[in-house]
Amino acid sequence: MEIAFDLSSIFTDNIQRLEKADLLKYSPKQYWAVAKSIDTLGEMSSKFHGWKRIITMYEKIIDHDEDQTVYILWDKVDGNKSVLKGILRVGYKTLYLTDNEQNQYMEKAMCILDFFIVPTEQRSGNGFNMFDAMLKAENVLVEQCAFDKPSAALRQFLEKYYDQKEPVMQSNKYAVFPNFFIGRHPTVPFTPRQTKRASRASSAVSSHTTSRNTSPIGRNRPRHDSVADLMRQDNFPRGRSVIDPNSPAGFKLTRDQRHEPIW
C-alpha cells in the first residue's frame, strides 16, 4: 500500500513506535501522512478481519482516555513515496479475567488491540518482526498479553512463533493463554458454593425422612381406621338376634326375667 509521502523525513525506524504524545506532535495539519497512514491501515485491518466498524483511527487514539501506542511497519520506495506494510496497536487495560479453574482476577495487562499485515506483505516475516519489536520495546512477554477478539490467523501466528496454545476465552471477548495466570493471585478464588449448599439440603431432607419413618413413637402407635373404612356397612354394629322362646336359651331367659321378651 503506497502513500505519496516520504515517511523517512519524520520516521526514524522502519517499525516506528508512536505514543499519544508523538501523534499529537505530528498533527494532521503539518504531517498529514501520519494520520493518513494510521487511518488507511486501520480501515484495511477492519475489512480484513470482517469487523463492522473501523477500530483504529488517528482521532480515536488521541481522544482515548487510556494511553495507546501504535507501531507502523513501512518502507521507503523510489521518489517521495513510502509503502505501508502493517500496523499494531497496543495499550494497558484493567481487565476482569477468569482462568480454567473459574478463579477470577482483576489485572492490568498489555492488550493487543489491533494487529494487521497487508496481505501482499504477509509470509515474509514482517508480522513476527513487528510483533517481536513491540514485545521488546514494551518489555513484556507474549504470555503476559491479552488479545482483543483474536482471529484464527492471530491464534495460528501465536502458536507458530511463540508456542501459545489453547487460549482462555473471556466473556469480554478478550483472550489470554494459561501461562498468563502463573504467579498471579485471584481476587475471587473459586469455591463450589452451589454444590455444597445443594449437598447440605439433600442431606437434611434425607435425614428428616429417615427419622420420620423410623420414629419409635410412630412405630408402636395403634392403627386408626379411616373415615371411609368406618362408613363401610360391614363395620356397623349388627342388630340383636331374636331368641326363640321355645329354645333352651328362651326358657332360661323367661325363667330368669319372669316375663316374655318384648323384642
Swiss-Prot record:
Residue span(s) of domain N-acetyltransferase: 1-181
EC number: 2.3.1.108
Domain of life of the native organism: Eukaryota
Biased composition (Low complexity): 200-212
Alphabetical keyword list: Acyltransferase, Transferase
Gene Ontology terms: cellular component: microtubule
Skewed-composition ranges (Basic and acidic residues): 253-263
Keyword rRNA-binding: no
InterPro entries: Atat, GNAT_ATAT
Pfam families in the cross-refs: Acetyltransf_16 (PF05301)
Region: Disordered, residue numbers: 191-224, 236-263
Residues that hold acetyl-CoA according to the record: 115-128
Record PANTHER family: ALPHA-TUBULIN N-ACETYLTRANSFERASE 1, ALPHA-TUBULIN N-ACETYLTRANSFERASE 2
Family to which the UniProt record says this protein belongs: Belongs to the acetyltransferase ATAT1 family.
Protein name, entry field: Alpha-tubulin N-acetyltransferase 2
Record gene name: atat-2
